[in-house]
């Protein structure tokens, strides 16, 4: 019976995980996105040969996640353009006391290594923990100083938030200004990005509250912004400002932007918070525990698209943005891709329901074989989840369960563990009853 249930769940997830073709037209695709993800707030901005069009709330503020890196990258590139720092400057010279090791030997990291995501750091929270809420950029940098890199700097690409938070500290140490002050005065104000903020905006009225999946629904969900994590992923913006931002990049109104574009020559290149893709487009995605976003643009096609949402369904958000871009450039758009957290929500919603059913069955049955089989299977499943998920996601179980994963995940896990304990207790009771019967 257990095997049939598991196979049924897997089959259902596989069917629901296949891309589903979206309706043609941007409005239709946005409606399809809302229907599939249960996300209530989606804002889209399109740049098409100088004309900007908005879909949804253009003034509502979203966390833009790792789209923030392109702002930090531009801030650093401006310092390079002014000669205040050089790409081959050592990080240890720009951040006093900071060291890094590879193969147990101290090695030099450069500014370019950070900009190109070739530092040797990875995005593993286990190996390189993010800052706590009270940490400054300097305190966080010192907390990871001296840690072993996963590869020799400059040799292998590995996406990491560490690189761009270090760049934020380099901005502070080079300019004598706070990261926030520099980014506002040198990037946001000159580009007239009045609504974009470094971290949480002072005026919170226009913030669209983030949300989190759970039981095939969404719930409002807020996560405190950590000051030392802002340079890599915690700007707020709206599609009104992003339209201005895209216009500047597509029309080439800034020499630092041109320098960044020139650093993205071939497919897969990463530089200053941007990546070049197979079709020659340039873009970046963003995802925090309660928001997801994506931006892509092409100077050649004079097309740009950005999608902002208040739900962490990054893969689905990416596919929506890519589909809109494809349609605008005369290509066939694909389907909306089911995000991993959506799949998890489907699985653990089912696990929760199944767990409750098994709990009831365990409480009413007196069959030792059923209790032993069910208890053993649930114990094995619980242990595998507890051990494997941190390995798969490169983060602690607590962080996965209570910050990133859908609410159904931790609920389902607690139900599984409860079932294991209750089944064991019931088995002891059944055996005791049998013993008393035989004695009597």
Where are these regions (language model features)?
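Short active-site loop at a secondary-structure junction
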Residues: 37-40, 54-113, 151-161, 230, ...
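Active-site SXXK
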Residues: 30, 44, 50, 63-88, ...
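Cross-kingdom Sec-pathway N-terminal secretion signals
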Residues: 6, 20-24, 28, 63, ...
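Extracytoplasmic/secreted envelope proteins and their assembly/folding machinery
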Residues: 27-31, 73, 88, 92-95, ...
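N-terminal Sec-pathway targeting helices
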Residues: 1-7, 368-373
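Short, surface-exposed loop or secondary-structure junction motifs
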Residues: 103-289
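Catalytic loop of the DD-peptidase/beta-lactamase superfamily, centered on the K-T-G motif
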Residues: 23-49, 223-440
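Hydrophobic secretory-pathway targeting helix
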Residues: 2-24, 46-49
């Amino acid at each position: 019976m257990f095997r049939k249930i598991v196979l049924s769940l897997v089959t259902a997830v596989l069917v629901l995980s296949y891309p589903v073709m979206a309706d043609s037209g941007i409005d239709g695709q946005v409606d399809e996105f809302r229907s599939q993800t249960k996300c209530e707030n989606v804002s889209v901005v399109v740049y098409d040969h100088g004309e900007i069009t908005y879909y949804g709330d253009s003034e509502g503020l979203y966390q833009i996640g790792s789209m923030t890196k392109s702002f930090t990258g531009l801030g650093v590139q401006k310092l390079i353009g002014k000669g205040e720092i050089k790409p081959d400057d050592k990080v240890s010279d720009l951040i006093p006391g900071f060291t890094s090791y590879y193969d147990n030997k101290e090695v030099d990291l450069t500014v370019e290594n950070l900009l190109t995501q070739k530092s040797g750091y990875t995005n593993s929270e286990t190996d390189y923990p993010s800052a706590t809420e009270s940490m400054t950029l300097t305190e966080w940098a010192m907390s990871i100083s001296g840690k072993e890199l996963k590869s020799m700097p400059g040799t292998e690409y590995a996406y990491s938030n560490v690189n761009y938070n270090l760049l934020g500290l380099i901005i502070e140490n080079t300019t004598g200004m706070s990261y926030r002050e520099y980014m506002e005065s040198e990037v946001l104000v000159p580009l007239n990005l009045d609504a974009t903020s470094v971290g949480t905006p002072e005026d919170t009225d226009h913030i669209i509250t983030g949300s989190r999946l759970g039981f095939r629904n969404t719930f409002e969900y807020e996560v405190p912004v950590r000051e030392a994590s802002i340079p890599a992923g915690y700007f707020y913006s709206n599609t009104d400002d992003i339209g201005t931002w895209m216009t500047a990049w597509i029309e080439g109104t800034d020499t630092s932007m041109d320098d960044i574009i020139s650093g993205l020559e071939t497919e897969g290149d990463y530089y200053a918070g941007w990546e070049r893709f197979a079709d020659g487009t340039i873009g970046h995605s963003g995802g925090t525990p309660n928001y997801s976003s994506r931006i892509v643009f092409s100077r050649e096609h004079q097309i740009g698209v950005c999608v902002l949402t208040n739900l962490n369904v990054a893969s689905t958000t990416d596919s929506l943005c890519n589909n809109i871009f494809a349609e605008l450039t005369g290509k066939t758009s694909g389907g909306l891709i089911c995000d991993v957290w959506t799949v998890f929500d489907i699985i653990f919603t089912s696990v929760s329901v199944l767990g409750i059913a098994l709990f009831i069955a365990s409480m009413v049955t007196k069959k030792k074989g059923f209790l032993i089989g069910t208890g053993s299977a649930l114990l094995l499943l619980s242990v595998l989840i507890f051990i494997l998920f941190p390995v798969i996601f490169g983060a602690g179980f607590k962080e996965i369960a209570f910050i990133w994963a859908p609410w159904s995940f931790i609920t389902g896990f607690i139900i599984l563990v409860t079932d294991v304990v209750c089944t064991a207790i019931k088995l002891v009771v059944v055996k005791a009853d049998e013993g008393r019967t035989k004695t009597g």
